[in-house]
């Protein structure tokens, strides 16, 4: 706590020092201009120059310097709604610099709340939230949730966790720790400060389902020792912890079971089907489909998910709620759709079917409709066009920085991937 206070003090001193130096520099410049002005006046009296034109010539560079300084030191933020002290909440988002977390940050900031983002940048990126840095309602903390955090908040959105196969398979122990120890720490924080906690769980708790579509009362069909178990079982344990704290300690909890989500700020090479297909299509490479492509998925756009998370947090629903799009497509249909939207000549390449790849996944969202008044509203093609536009820009950015990412498959066994 002392070291954090010292850092804030040093930061404040540095800001004051910078302002002082800028002030001195401007005063020196004005003094120089004034000296030239006096000299020019003397020259004019001798009939050698017209002072009016020279004043304008000298003042214009000063105006330019002031404009440049304003651009450098005045950060323009997205529009933020004003909330009274009574209505404004102090909100913590773990994993807030990640794909979904950064969009949730945008939503809550623009709604007028005070938002603290905690991220260890294992998969999150500072770029995703840098447009809020410096805003009085925003704070970014580099912190791993497996370590305790001491902060006063009203709500906690616990999103911290690797969520794509390459990331959680690369470090399964870290994934387990984040979903168990990290969740335990956030529940402890919620208990201490009386905050409400929302756990970002997953449709993976249903495993390879034997019931279709999947409703919240389905217990699932999960392989507890498979290659994905670190994530699937980690989330199942996290849910158990939430309800244990609710029953024993009276902590208010909300649990969102999130289905496949896509949109801007996804990692380009995270191994998910959306990012893989878009990247392959944009680069003119074959779109890789594992198995026959008859497996089904239902994809929701990220803004729909964010609205669902906020609605759930502010509701009285303490039991798990599915958040997903019930519009179902086969993987093959999805590959063809992305190919057409990109306008790509890429072929579709069929590879061996992956281990533990669910054959069907579709959420039953009756509960979300009835109890939250929520359902997805962004059409699939509209969302995909936004994602494609983002990926085009990312490719340009990477090209300018001499790096072109390649689609990264999730390693399961013998180099195989699965559709996510």
From Swiss-Prot:
Listed cofactors: NAD(+)
Residue spans, topological domain Cytoplasmic: 1-19
Active site residues per record: 231
Binding site for NAD(+): 98-100, 119-120, 122-124, 144-145, 159, 161, 178, 200, 231, 235, 261, 267, 272
Record's subcellular location: Golgi apparatus, Golgi stack membrane
Residue ranges annotated as Lumenal topological domain: 41-420
Catalytic reaction annotation: UDP-alpha-D-glucuronate + H(+) = UDP-alpha-D-xylose + CO2
GO cellular component: Golgi cisterna membrane
Protein EC: 4.1.1.35
Major localization class: Golgi
Root EC class: lyase
CDD domains noted in UniProt: UGD_SDR_e
Cited Pfam families: GDP_Man_Dehyd, UXS1_N
Keywords noted in UniProt: Acetylation, Decarboxylase, Glycoprotein, Golgi apparatus, Lyase, Membrane, NAD, Phosphoprotein, Signal-anchor, Transmembrane, Transmembrane helix
Subunit structure: Homodimer and homotetramer. Interacts with AKT1.
Protein name as annotated: UDP-glucuronic acid decarboxylase 1
């Amino acid at each position: 706590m002392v070291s954090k206070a010292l850092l804030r003090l040093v930061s404040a001193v540095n800001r004051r020092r910078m302002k002082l130096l800028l002030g001195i520099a401007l005063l020196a410049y004005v003094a120089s201009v004034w000296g030239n002005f006096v000299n020019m006046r003397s020259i004019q009296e001798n009939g050698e120059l017209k002072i009016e034109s020279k004043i304008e010539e000298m003042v214009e560079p000063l105006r330019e310097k002031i404009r440049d300084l304003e651009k450098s030191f005045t950060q323009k933020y997205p529009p933020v709604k004003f909330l009274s002290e009574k209505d404004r909440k102090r909100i913590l988002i773990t994993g807030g610099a990640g794909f979904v977390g950064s969009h949730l940050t945008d939503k809550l900031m623009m709604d007028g709340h005070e938002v603290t983002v905690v991220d260890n940048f294992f998969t999150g990126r500072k770029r995703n939230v840098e447009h809020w840095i410096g805003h009085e309602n925003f704070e970014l903390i580099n912190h791993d949730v497996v370590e305790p955090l001491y902060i006063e908040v009203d709500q906690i959105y616990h999103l911290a966790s690797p969520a794509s196969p390459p990331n959680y398979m690369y470090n399964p122990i870290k994934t387990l720790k984040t979903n168990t120890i990290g969740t335990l720490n956030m529940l402890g924080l919620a208990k201490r400060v009386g905050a409400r906690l929302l756990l970002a769980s997953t449709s993976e708790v249903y495993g390879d389902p034997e019931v279709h579509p999947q409703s919240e009362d389905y217990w699932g069909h999960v392989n507890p020792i498979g290659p994905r178990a670190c994530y699937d079982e980690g989330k199942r344990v996290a849910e158990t912890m939430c309800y244990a704290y609710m029953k024993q300690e009276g902590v208010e909890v909300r649990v969102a079971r999130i289905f496949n989500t896509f949109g801007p700020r996804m990692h380009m090479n995270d191994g998910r089907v959306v990012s893989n297909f878009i990247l392959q299509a944009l680069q003119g490479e074959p779109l890789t489909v594992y198995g026959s492509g008859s497996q089904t998925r239902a994809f929701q756009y990220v803004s729909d998910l964010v609205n669902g998370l906020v609605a759930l947090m502010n509701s009285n629903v303490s039991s798990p709620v599915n958040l997903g799009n019930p519009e179902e497509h086969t993987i093959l249909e999805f590959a063809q759709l992305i190919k057409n939207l990109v306008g790509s000549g890429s072929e579709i390449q069929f590879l061996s079917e992956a281990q533990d790849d669910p054959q069907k996944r579709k959420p039953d969202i009756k509960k979300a409709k009835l109890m939250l008044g929520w359902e997805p509203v962004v059409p699939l093609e509209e969302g995909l066009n936004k994602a494609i536009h983002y990926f085009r820009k990312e490719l340009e950015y990477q090209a300018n920085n001499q790096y072109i990412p390649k689609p990264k498959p999730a390693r399961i066994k013998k180099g195989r991937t699965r559709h996510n």
